Swiss-Prot record:
Tissue-wise expression: Highly expressed exclusively within the subventral esophageal gland cell during syncytium formation in host plants (at protein level).
Function: Plays a role in the differentiation or division of feeding cells (syncytia) induced in plant roots during infection. Promotes host root growth.
UniProt key word Transmembrane: no
Gene that encodes the chain: 16D10
Record protein name field: CLAVATA3/ESR (CLE)-related protein 16D10
Family designation: Belongs to the CLV3/ESR signal peptide family.
Length: 43
């Protein structure tokens, strides 16, 4: 029962963590773009 609730918690938290990672990546990208010689050049 306890492990089942942990599984549900992970299932609920997974999209939140993914969105947080995507947000942080986009923020890092936005911070990197102005300082780079060619913005959006290296992916």
């Amino acid at each position: 029962m306890f492990t089942n609730s942990i599984k549900n918690l992970i299932i609920y938290l997974m999209p939140l963590m993914v969105t947080l990672m995507l947000l942080s990546v986009s923020f890092v990208d936005a911070g990197k773009k102005p300082s780079g010689p060619n913005p959006g050049g290296n992916n």
